[in-house]
């Protein structure tokens, strides 16, 4: 090993000044791309604080479509399920509607699934959304462009609607979920019945991670956007259970805080700001994998990663949904 180092040193000294400068420049560039430079410049999470941002955020004026209220008023408790869906994912929404999205009342609890979508430039897709909304009356549409980094704007819309549904009773609980999840509604209801709407509940699959500084990573974030060494604990945005008290706290603060492009991390920031703890629940399964019948029977609530056909097949195989 020592001999190898000596040989490398000798070789390096034999290089021209230009070659040495080139190696130095490439090394610094690679360290920058890999995010190593940013890692050394991060602020300790112990000094975390999130800035306020003055803006006139009138969320309700950004809604372009509202779902029809389908609560009968006869339930002991109410759960609104707001399903995040890309505007182009019409077939997936159809699969949800005919599988776990069919439930309206179970064990005295009313359930109302709706879909929140953004806007796309493709007018044919927007026309289909119009038809779908007219047919099912379960679309909550916002005027912002439907994109990954605009998911925080969908979060704003979902929280605003859940806090004050249009011409509808306010729910006791809100379940935010992506359209590629399989949700076991009886287990969700059973879980909800252990909670009170006055509790502060922000629950799901919790992550406690550091920011990605690798420049080419999908979740890369700059120091200007987020200077701290860690994120606050946050629930994966794919499946989040909230009480009405938590929704109220979130809504009161969400308009005042500086935006962040990743909705799950932003919710963690929001929760930390208003002193709501993120609670980990193993029955919200984030990693894509096969779930056994025993796991469903034992209380699994939501599982991530289903394509349309897989969702329909898995649902048809499950017991306990009837």
Swiss-Prot record:
Expressed in the gut. It is a single-pass type II membrane protein. Glycans are attached at residue 150. GO terms for molecular function: acetylglucosaminyltransferase activity; UDP-glycosyltransferase activity. It is an enzyme of class 2 (transferase). It comes from the Eukaryota. One of its GO terms (cellular component) is Golgi membrane. Residues 38-322 are lumenal. It is found in: Golgi apparatus membrane. Pfam families: Galactosyl_T (PF01762). Its main location: Golgi. Residues 1-16 are cytoplasmic. Its EC number is 2.4.1.-. Keywords: Glycoprotein, Glycosyltransferase, Golgi apparatus, Insecticide resistance, Membrane, Signal-anchor, Transferase, Transmembrane, Transmembrane helix. InterPro entries: Glyco_trans_31. Disruption phenotype: Worms exhibit resistance to the Cry5B and Cry14A toxins produced by Bacillus thuringiensis. This is thought to be due to mutants having reduced population of glycolipids which are targeted by the Cry proteins. Belongs to the glycosyltransferase 31 family. PANTHER family: BETA-1,3-GALACTOSYLTRANSFERASE BRN, BETA-1,3-N-ACETYLGLUCOSAMINYLTRANSFERASE. Transfers N-acetylgalactosamine onto mannose groups of carbohydrate substrates. Required for susceptibility to pore-forming crystal toxins in conjunction with bre-1, bre-2, bre-3, and bre-4. Involved in resistance to the nematotoxic C.cinerea galectin Cgl2. This is Beta-1,3-galactosyltransferase bre-5. It comes from Caenorhabditis elegans. The lineage of its organism: Eukaryota, Metazoa, Ecdysozoa, Nematoda, Chromadorea.
């Amino acid at each position: 090993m020592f001999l190898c180092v000596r040989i490398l040193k000798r070789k390096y000294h034999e290089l021209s000044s230009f070659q040495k400068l080139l190696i130095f420049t490439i090394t610094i560039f690679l360290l920058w791309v890999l995010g190593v430079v940013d890692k050394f410049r991060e602020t300790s999470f112990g000094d975390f604080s999130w800035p306020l941002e003055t803006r006139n955020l009138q969320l309700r004026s950004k809604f372009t479509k509202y779902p029809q209220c389908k609560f009968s008023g006869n339930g002991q408790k109410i759960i609104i399920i707001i399903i995040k869906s890309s505007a182009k994912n019409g077939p997936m929404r159809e699969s949800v509607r005919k599988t776990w999205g069919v439930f309206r009342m179970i064990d005295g609890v009313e359930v109302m699934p709706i879909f929140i979508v953004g806007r796309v430039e493709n007018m044919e897709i927007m026309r289909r959304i119009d038809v779908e909304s007219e047919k099912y009356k379960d679309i909550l549409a916002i005027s912002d462009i439907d994109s990954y980094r605009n998911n925080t704007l969908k979060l704003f819309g979902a929280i605003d609607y859940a806090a004050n549904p249009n011409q509808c009773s306010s729910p006791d609980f809100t379940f935010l979920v992506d359209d590629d999840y399989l949700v076991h509604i009886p287990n969700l209801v059973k879980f909800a019945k252990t909670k009170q709407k006055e509790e502060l509940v922000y629950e799901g699959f919790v992550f406690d991670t550091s920011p990605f500084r690798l420049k080419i990573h999908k979740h890369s974030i700059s120091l200007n956007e987020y200077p701290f060494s860690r994120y606050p604990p946050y629930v994966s945005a794919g499946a989040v259970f909230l009480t009405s008290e938590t929704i109220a706290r979130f809504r009161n603060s969400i308009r005042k805080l500086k935006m962040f492009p990743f909705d799950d991390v932003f919710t963690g920031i929001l929760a930390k700001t208003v002193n709501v703890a993120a609670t980990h629940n193993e029955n919200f399964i984030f990693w894509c994998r096969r779930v056994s019948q025993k796991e469903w029977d034992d209380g699994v609530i939501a599982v991530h990663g289903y394509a349309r056909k897989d969702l329909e097949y898995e649902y048809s195989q499950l017991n306990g949904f009837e």
